[in-house]
Amino acid sequence: NKIKPGVAYSVITTENDTQTVFVDMPRLERRRANPKDVAAVILGGGEGTKLFPLTSRTATPAVPVGGCYRLIDIPMSNCINSAINKIFVLTQYNSAPLNRHIARTYFGNGVSFGDGFVEVLAATQTPGEAGKKWFQGTADAVRKFIWVFEDAKNKNIENIVVLSGDHLYRMDYMELVQNHIDRNADITLSCAPAEDSRASDFGLVKIDSRGRVVQFAEKPKGFDLKAMQVDTTLVGLSPQDAKKSPYIASMGVYVFKTDVLLKLLKWSYPTSNDFGSEIIPAAIDDYNVQAYIFKDYWEDIGTIKSFYNASLALTQEFPEFQFYDPKTPFYTSPRFLPPTKIDNCKIKDAIISHGCFLRDCSVEHSIVGERSRLDCGVELKDTFMMGADYYQTESEIASLLAEGKVPIGIGENTKIRKCIIDKNAKIGKNVSIINKDGVQEADRPEEGFYIRSGIIIILEKATIRDGTVI
């Protein structure tokens, strides 16, 4: 006795009040989500203004994180661990490092996708006035490649997961898709509880008792922000946590029925450029838009401050998030580097990546990226050092020092606090980078650094001369 949802059945009985009637309840079969029917779209084309200057030469998803990963590895690994093997990556600004990393990691001898694929869809211009414009927003980026989803090889894709390239979290996307199917949703937003202090940075939602989104506000301020407060005990938070996090924030992770997404972009809202501020608020009245509450660790690291804090939080003894998990590992480019060599160093609460050389130095509450060189007397504290893309030999280093030049890495007796050191930076001897005056914002590109929210950022390939004080 199998029935389908939405089909009514009736039972005819006799008029005899004393006769007992036995009815077998028909069995409702739950439709299982199949990853073969799902495609993922990772948005990697943003200008990255909030993460500037880290994005001055590279796209946001290619920014290093955790010592040896790139931000793109997070949604890519989540897709692989969720068995989603049809992945599109949309790129635009500074895309060369991102394209190179994806090719090294996920093509060729990297991760195997079986009958799936990873396709990089770079922003292009086409004939006609409209075709001469670059991506104008998240929705416009997907619209420009809508023909890809109408292609014959993608005809069986029923649901499309849209992902961002600047978040830190571990998630099974198929649980999200299963929730989407169970509720017969047209659109599902993955949401997380948000604290008062950061709520205005996100799109906020209000939901009814069935989880349907009834109101959506993109980054509201003032009275509009207060109006979006909800009782988050209704989504499973304890009274204490609900008091701290009285908002429900959209994570920027969406699931669309494929036909609904195509209809929204082509016919309903052909001039709308952004999912969060335009498409989704407009779709609430006409479509079944559901919220999926994600209660594990999630961090939007789209600003320098949040990127810095989330990165250094990884160094804690018991971090809220860690890249290591034997069941759901995070993948990155295989670099075939030797183990790190550490001579007579003091290291506390730190992450030291592959292929580093540390000599008689101190590292505390810091991340040291691959191929880093820390010389004698170096003190590194509250710092994320991204490392280098290549080695300099001992003879090359000696030759540079003899010529009064600065090799890649950190020279003798240099003190560094609260800093992000971008790739291939050259920091000399007896340098002090401590921001003694507590400057919050400064632009010194000609001197090789910026300051954002009190955090010093040493630029990629910058040279900081011996004895410099910042």
Swiss-Prot record:
EC number: 2.7.7.27
Pathway in which this enzyme or protein is active: Glycan biosynthesis; starch biosynthesis
UniProt-listed CDD domains: ADP_Glucose_PP, LbH_G1P_AT_C
Family, similarity comment: Belongs to the bacterial/plant glucose-1-phosphate adenylyltransferase family.
Enzyme class: transferase
Primary location: plastid
Key words, A-Z: Allosteric enzyme, Amyloplast, ATP-binding, Chloroplast, Nucleotide-binding, Nucleotidyltransferase, Plastid, Starch biosynthesis, Transferase
Subunit structure: Heterotetramer.
Catalytic activity: alpha-D-glucose 1-phosphate + ATP + H(+) = ADP-alpha-D-glucose + diphosphate
Tissue expression profile of the protein: Prominently expressed in the leaves and a weaker expression is seen in the tubers.
Subcellular location: Plastid, Chloroplast; Plastid, Amyloplast
GO MF terms, alphabetically ordered: ATP binding; glucose-1-phosphate adenylyltransferase activity
Annotated protein name in UniProt: Glucose-1-phosphate adenylyltransferase large subunit 1
Any one of the GO BP annotations: starch biosynthetic process
InterPro entries named in the record: ADP-Glc_PPase, ADP_Glu_pyroP_CS, NTP_transferase_dom, Nucleotide-diphossugar_trans, Trimer_LpxA-like_sf
GO cellular component: amyloplast; chloroplast
Function: This protein plays a role in synthesis of starch. It catalyzes the synthesis of the activated glycosyl donor, ADP-glucose from Glc-1-P and ATP.
Description of activity control: Activated by 3'phosphoglycerate, inhibited by orthophosphate. Allosteric regulation.
